[in-house]
């Protein structure tokens, strides 16, 4: 049976019925807070159950608890703060206080109604140190943190409409994947998180997981990324080619997850597992340096952190780095291959980008030709 939502209940906070009628009659007089795309995406993820059991942006008690203990104030595992920032000037000018309804807008488009419960300040340096394990502004997550407002607003929200989504036809929300898995008769599902196009190492890991479960959820992230990352549509196109040509029919669900990437390493690995639990996954594939960037985290820190959460409710699958062994004649890892480094060919993401950027097909021991062609055919595959 697919996993229960985190906290036991799948959140759904979409404005409807009488509440929507009231909103439509009063919204012109309500205070408005213009938010960037990242917060608009957070709002929709909150409302559609991606971040269950959260029903809105964190109040201070939950925020501080997550920062210090990696658990909500009710002791439920949670590792990444989901917070809404604002400038102090906006708070003073609008005169908002607890109990007020605030419209969150993106490019003027009403996205959600926030019922304000808490207004509090935060220490961005401490936040960076706890979440990212560094205060270095060169870390993309730290840099983004320092650019945010100096006040945080907490409270439950109701979605009016999500921000425009160019990948909507590829997007399934938790309530939809759960129905789909049930229709397929899947009792166990492994989820694979990615922000890259697939090479043979990814395929090796996914198929290893498929050996033990009924189905695979390939769940590429669409949202804020850093320069040099693959474009969302390129990742989808590449995975469609891989699944069509190299997977049995009916064992893989490909769905885009529109969620922000924090590059928070170990903490984010647990966060990604919790999110996939809400989608119904029973297992989550955790790779080497999961959600890492640069050299900020050790290669297997993302494995070690799971020991702190025996009550997580989803099984992590720790997969070793795959490489091509000339002696074995295929993709292997260090646990099953006895041969030395002179036989090992590691797949370099940087080298793949360089080759694909020049319009070259990588060697077939690195990437399937159909996948390479899907990427090369795009006029501008990188952000």
Curated annotation (Swiss-Prot):
It catalyses: sulfate + ATP + H(+) = adenosine 5'-phosphosulfate + diphosphate. Pathway: Sulfur metabolism; hydrogen sulfide biosynthesis; sulfite from sulfate: step 1/3. Its EC number is 2.7.7.4. Signal peptide: none annotated. It comes from the Archaea. Pfam families: ATP-sulfurylase (PF01747), PUA_2 (PF14306). GO terms for molecular function: ATP binding; sulfate adenylyltransferase (ATP) activity. The keyword ATP-binding applies. This is Sulfate adenylyltransferase.
């Amino acid at each position: 049976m697919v996993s229960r939502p985190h906290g036991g209940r799948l959140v759904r906070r979409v404005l409807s019925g009488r509440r929507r009628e009231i909103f439509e009659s009063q919204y012109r007089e309500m205070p408005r807070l213009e938010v960037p795309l990242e917060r608009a995406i957070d709002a929709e993820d909150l409302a559609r159950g991606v971040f269950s059991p959260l029903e809105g942006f964190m109040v201070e008690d939950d925020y501080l608890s997550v920062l210090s203990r990696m658990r909500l104030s009710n002791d439920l595992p949670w590792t990444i703060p989901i917070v809404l920032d604002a400038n102090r000037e906006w708070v003073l000018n609008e005169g908002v206080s607890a109990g007020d309804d605030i419209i969150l807008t993106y490019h003027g488009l009403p996205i959600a109604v926030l019922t304000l419960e808490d207004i509090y300040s935060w220490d961005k340096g401490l936040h960076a140190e706890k979440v990212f394990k560094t205060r270095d502004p060169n870390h993309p997550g730290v840099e983004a943190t320092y650019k945010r407002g100096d006040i945080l607003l907490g409270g439950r929200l109701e979605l009016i409409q999500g921000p425009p989504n160019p990948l909507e036809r590829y997007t399934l929300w938790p309530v939809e994947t759960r129905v789909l898995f049930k229709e397929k008769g899947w009792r166990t599902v492994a989820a694979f998180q990615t922000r890259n196009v697939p090479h043979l190492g990814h395929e090796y890991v996914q198929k290893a997981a498929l050996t033990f479960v009924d189905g695979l959820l390939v769940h590429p992230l669409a949202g804020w990324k850093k320069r040099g990352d693959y474009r969302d549509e390129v990742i989808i196109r590449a995975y469609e080619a891989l699944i069509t040509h190299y997977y049995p029919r009916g064992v893989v669900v490909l769905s885009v997850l529109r969620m922000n990437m924090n590059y928070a390493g170990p903490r984010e690995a647990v966060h990604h597992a919790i999110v996939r639990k809400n989608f119904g996954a029973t297992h989550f594939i955790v790779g080497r340096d999961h959600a890492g960037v640069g050299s900020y985290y050790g290669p297997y820190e993302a494995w070690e952190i799971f020991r702190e959460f025996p009550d997580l409710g989803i099984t992590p699958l720790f997969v070793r780095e795959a490489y091509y062994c000339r002696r074995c004649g295929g993709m292997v890892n260090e646990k099953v291959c006895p041969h030395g480094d002179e036989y090992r060919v590691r797949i370099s993401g940087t080298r793949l980008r360089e080759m694909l950027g020049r319009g070259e097909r990588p060697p077939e021991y690195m990437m399937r030709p159909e996948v390479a062609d899907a990427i090369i055919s795009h006029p501008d595959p990188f952000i």
